[in-house]
Every structure is written in structure tokens, then in C-alpha cells.
Curated annotation (Swiss-Prot):
Domain Helicase C-terminal stretches: 473-618
Gene Ontology CC: nucleolus
Organism: Cryptococcus neoformans var. neoformans serotype D (strain JEC21 / ATCC MYA-565) (Filobasidiella neoformans)
Residue stretches of biased makeup (Basic residues): 8-17, 752-772
Assigned protein family: Belongs to the DEAD box helicase family. DDX24/MAK5 subfamily.
Protein name per the record: ATP-dependent RNA helicase MAK5
Domain notes: The Q motif is unique to and characteristic of the DEAD box family of RNA helicases and controls ATP binding and hydrolysis.
Amino acid sequence: MAKIDKKTKLKLNKKSVRAPSKPTTEKKPKKYVTADTLTWKPVKTSSFSGIDGGGGMMMLEELEDVGIEWEETDGGRKIAKFVEVESKTSKGKKNAAQEEPNQEGRGDDEKASSASETEEGKKADDKEAVEEDDEEEFPDFAGFAEEDLNAADEEEHPNLDDEPAFNDDLLPEWSSISLHPSLKRSFLASSFTAPTAIQSRAIPAGITGRDVVGVAETGSGKTLAYSLPILHYLLGQRKSKAGIKRPLSALVLCPTRELALQVMDHLNALLKHALATPDGEKPQGPPRVSVGSVVGGLSAQKQKRILERGCDVIVATPGRLWDLIKADDELATSVRTLRFLVIDEADRMIENGHFAELESIVKLTQRSTAQQGPDDDDPVFQAMATLFEESTAREDMQTFVFSATLSKDLQKNLKRRSRSWKGKGKRSSTLEDLVEKLDFRDENPEVIDLSPEGGVVSSLRESMIESTKDDKDLYLYYFLLRYPGRSIVFVNSIDSIRRLLPLFTLLQLPVFPLHSHLQQKQRLKNLDRFKSNPKGILIATDVAARGLDIPQVDHVVHFNLPRTADAYIHRSGRTARAQNEGFALQLVSPDEKSVQRALMKSLERTHELPDLPIEAGFLPSLRERLRVATEIEKAQHRATKATHDKNWLLEAAEAMDIDIDPSMLDGEDDDPDAPYYKPKKQDRGKGKASVENLKMELKALLQEKLVARGVSIRYPTSGSKVIVDDLIKSTGHGMLLGASTSKAYDQVEKTGKRKLGSGRPGAVKKKKVEGR
């Protein structure tokens, strides 16, 4: 009998075992789904609202196991459709179930290899499951389905009655304010040991149900003054039951996107410590209090999903919020039944071009809509008429209005709650119109006026330098070198920024622009660079004057004087924040003297600002540096303009489908009247060589030491100023040899000695000639 080897036997066994026929499966129909029904996962980004390394990309979400098909419409446009795709995990389980009956027909070797593969696959599945768990570790409530949110909320948060009490001895300054214990634990973790003046007065009124109108300088803690009563109320409420959407409790309206994101960051930072577990870790699951933002520049689709899943506090800008309200009746109902309405930076809000949207949002919160208004013919309000009949505004809604400026007359009228004060012959301001439309539930709102005398805080020192218009660059350069630190230079036009920026860049100063024509991504990047540089210089228009909380700003320079007192207050308020010292400098040219005098009178000043002492010995060297840098900047500007003109001519010709005469581009004729004037080649060569020579000259000037008068570099122990001790101890000025290291704050007194409008001592006064 022939011997059969093992391999032949294995082949025979395989042939004898007939493979089962594949079941005939029909192709499943495609299942289309909408974007709102999908489970979106938030993409983890870095801190500060996603701008640290995120390039301005914020609040991104991603999808898995979803296909996309593009359907072309009659007009040629393509519409994306989401197709449900079977996930890899479920598909793998089905395949394993189908292959299970076939395991008996395999050989021993094949079974062993299959077992090892199954074990490896199991490990891989476990690894994927762990990675998915890590991805779904809760960074934002928007990444969870509504059922998961409510179920996790029931499991993670204990009964509120079991909340442990807080030992007030740890924070004695907060003992008089009966806030939720979790908030006080957050204060302790954040080293927030004492409330500010506005907080100590606004918070007790807010937690007792009063309406509050607060007036305080910038940087005084107004954000927490209205946020803490809201969080105190929300933390005192019981958690929502499973399957019930979170109701919108508070709406915070801000004038700009940057301020709205900043407020949301403050709230989340406070809640992070307040809701932390005893071991200091962040609790798993959705937050007890959810905070979201609705601002322009981000995906409206994502913001709709956030609102649909439910949110306790919404921080929004009026424009984007009103766009969403017009498309969503449920959101309009949520706004109508608010528990808290906050208007932050009210004076800025009415200047930002969103007064119409703000007025419409405020109208939703009014208890009575019987009065006729200019928006009654709006189809949006007509569509909401039946909705308003079904839902009524809350009687216990609290309104918080905070601003850096508010007229005294308006404050008095708010206290009296007199509705007849507008028709006294005096035209009301837009801010007064806004406050008049607010339906305060409190008959006598708590008006807290902590605005400082003279419009600025006591820790701010002001000074001025009187110079000609052409010498402003020189004195600005001197100030930035003499007093290094984080400084903001305010100008009145974008053209001034475009002129100063290349000039001071050539002088090797860390300057960054900020104005409204910059893209949002570039604005955030420049702000981030300015914050990270302790000697950074921000040249900005009034877009940076309000709302932005930039820490540790040492100086504010008014290169051009503002036209209003409010703008001056907000500009100067970028420094001396949170009881820190600050310095504000005015550069005043002769044609601005009348503007400055009117500005000071509107601030109720009686004395001129003190002059900043100038060490004139440094000015000649600085003037020479500026002269060379200005020539370089002008030459580069001419070259850039010539290239721009040429490119414009080529693009215009291409758009009109015409040919250009080559002589217009390549001609050697030196004809300034030609459509495109092109200098001769030798002249262009001379221009390039001249710029290179100027750059070498500027480099040499920048390497030279700037020495004060009376100082000898070769003989430091002699001369009228002895600097040998400063050189040995390295205590002298880093840029100006022989200059003192005192701060600008210490160089001037709080108030000047000359009365406002009295003129300088020794100046020749013009005699008034009487007419005949």
C-alpha cells in the first residue's frame, strides 16, 4: 500500500470538504443621512481658542464611517450628500460570524494560525477601542449625542444636596459673598484671593435677583462681575433628566468675536477648577455647566448643532446670533425665556454696526409686544407672532449691562425709571436708546458707577511731548528705546500703520500691525506674537482699543490723538489693568493742540499734562538713523509701486483681451508721461546700488553706541557723567549709554503744574486787537 505523506493528505481533505456556496445577497439600498443626525467628534486643538499653532482654525469637528456623494443640480452646482457606511468594527464582527461554521473543516496547522491571527486581531481591536476612548475623552459637549449627554450627566454628577461646604477661612475676603462652594474652590485654585471693587458690589446684587448696570474702567474685572451670579444660579440647579434638552439660561452679548471668545475662555477656566474632582482631575463626561459661543467667522452649521444639543450659557455677537434666530423658531423661544441677559461693553456695542440686530434680540426679551415699533413690519417678526403668543417672557429675568462709560444723566434716569426723560429738548444718544429698550424686571436697577475721576484709573500716569508733525517719528523712536517694554502705539488711520511699520522694522524693533483690513488669522497671530514678546510694539488703530485683555502692557502711546473722550479712555485702558501701574503718552503737534485742549476739558481736567523729560543728547544720532531708514523705505516703496503698476497693466490687458505695445514695458525711453514709465537700465542699477549702500550705512549706524552728553567711552571714570559703576555692575541702560534706568511712570508727576490753556511759561502771548 502506498504511503501518503502529510501534505497530500491535507490536499485530499481540502478537496473532500466542499466549500459552502456563497449566499446570494442583494445589494442594500443606500441610506442617506443629514449632517445633524451624525455623531461629530471635536478635534483637539491647543489653548487660547485654537490660535496657538492652530493658525486661527477653531472649533473643528470630524466624522467617521460616512461616505460623501456629490449630486449635480440643474444650475451646475454640486451638493454633498452623506451616505451611511458600515463601520469597520461591525463589519469585522459580521465576517467573523460568517467564517465560524467553516472552522471545523480546517487542518490543525490552519487552526493554529487562525487562532494566532484572531488573537492579534483582538489585540488590535482592543487598541483601537482604547484610542477611540481617548478621542472621546470629553473636550467639548458638542461631540456627544443627546442621549449620551443626559445619561453621562446622570451618572457623573452627584446629588447637589451633598455638595461639601467651603471653609471661608481660606478666603476671608470672599466670606461676605455667599457664592456656591464650587466657585470658591475655583478661586482658591486660581489664587483669586479678593474681589475687585466692581465685583464686591455687583455680585451680591446679582445673586439676590437684582438688575445691575455697572460702570467701571477697563481691566476692573467686569467679566466675573456678571459671570459669577450666572454660574452661582446654574450650579444650584438640579441636573436635567435623561432625554431632556438643556434649556438656554444665559445669553452674553459682546461687540466683537475676540471679546466673545475671551469671555468664553474665562468662564471655562473658572468651571475647570470648580467642577474638578477632589484629586484635581477633570471629571469624565459632559460638563455640569456647558458654555458655547456663537460668533461670526466660524461654521454656522456647527453652531446650529451646539444649540440643538442644548447649552446653558451662550456667548455671542449680535450679527451671527440674529442670523440663526431668523432661521430657528426654537432658538427664538429660548431667547424669549432667558433667565439672564448680559450686554458687555455696551458703549462699544452701539458703535460696531450691529445696533439693529441687538435691538431685535432685545425686543424678544420684552414682556409686552403691544407697542408698535419700526421692526413690526419685518417678516421675521410677523412669522414669530404666533410663537410669542404661545411663549411668554420670564418675569424673573435679570439684565446686566456693563460699560466703561455711561452718562450721569442716564444713570439718574435709570434710578428714577422715568419714561418721560427723553423728550426734554435734548437729543438722546444711541446708548440711551438701547438702555431705554431694555425691559428691566427690577423697578430700580442697581446702578454701580466706579468710573474714576478724569476718566482713567489712579494707577495710570499721563504725559505728553509737544513736537512738530515731522518730528513725531523721532520722539516715538526715542521713547521706545529709552523706555523698553510692551507698548501699544495708537494711530488714526491704516495708512499711518503702513508707513510706520516698515520704518521701525528697518530700525530692528519688534513691531506688529493690527487693523481692520488684516485677515482674522493674521490679526490673531500678531496679537499672539505681541503677547509673547516682553518688548513687543503693537501699532494699531482703535480696533485694539476695547475689549481685548492683553496682560502686562507697560505703555500706551497716542501717536495721533483720538477725536472722542471715550476713545481716549479705552485706549489708555489697555495699560494699568488690574491695579497695575501704567503709562500713557500723547504726541501733540501744533495743529492738534486745540483737539487736546477740548479732549482734556471733556474729561473735566483743570491742568495740563506734565511734559516727559527728554535727554536731548541722544536725538542727533537717532535723527540720523531715521533719515537713512526713511530713504530706504521710500526707495523700496517706489520699487514696489512700479512692480504693482506693471502687474496691474498686464492683468487689465489680459482681462480686456488686448495686446500691449512692447515699448510700454521694455522701452528704453525715459518718458514720465508714458502709460507705463520705466527708467533706463543704468538708472535702475544705480537705484539698487543706492539702496544697498543705504542699508550698509544704516547697519553701521545701528551698531554704533548711543552715548549721552558728558559721557566718555574711552575714559568712563571722567566726564560730567561717570558710568564706570554701571559698566561694572551691568546696571546701566541697555540701549542708551549714560541714560538712567528709571521707568516712564516714575519720570512724571500725577498732575501737571500748569493750568489747562494757560500756555507755557515765557511764551509770548498775542495781544487782542480791538476793532474800531
